[in-house]
Amino acid sequence: MSAYNYPNFRTENGYLTETIRQKYLTNAIADKRVPANAHRIAALVSLTASNDTSQPIQFWQLYSVLGPERIVALIENFYTRVYRDETWFSSVFSRLGDLQQHVGTQSSMWIDVMGGGQAYHGGEYRLSFHHTHNAIALMNDRGAQRWVKLMLETLNDPSIDLTDDARVRPSINTFLGHFMSKYAAEFKFNDKAAFGVGNGSVKRKINFMTMSSEAIEALSEAELIEALTARGVDVSRYGTKVALVNKALML
């Protein structure tokens, strides 16, 4: 029996959720980190984290686990560090507003992307405007490195409550890595961010019983071997793809 019964918090698409999810999955498909049909896998695009701990939590599912208070506490911890940092870094933020203003804005963005509903008004346009205008002085190697350093200190702070689900931190790492790579490409700085271990690959679940002959034949040899092995078949007895396909068709 699963130790979890998500959602812990009611979820809803935000202004950014669908757009960011679509872009992330498109990149992940290209990198073969998720199946080619990832956009159509209900459990993958759902806003609710899986109770199956063998499945990663996608970052748009984090709100269903964390809720608003944990997210706000994390962001407040981070910006407290920002405002205590060296002037060259902290002044870019302080000239735009006080600590609580930044906590509110950043928390809203995280909540919006992570499945907490329409919290970040203005969506992608607002996000782009902020980085191309308000934060442009830090959209470079030096600024990115300091931002990452402070965020890592925040995430590693034992006072931060990420729940007892070990999948949460890799999901946050994946979320941060996705945006850092996006900004590195857009503003042409080196993407050397290392937030820690991210989500593992999501493998396609293959059920031969629900597949047509054509669909089984279209599977790769590696997919056939993995799926047959999972069903207890000794694949060493089937040395070619044709033999593997024939065995799958018999099940």
Give the predicted meaning of each segment.
Residues 2-251:
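Core of compact, soluble alpha-helical bundle domains
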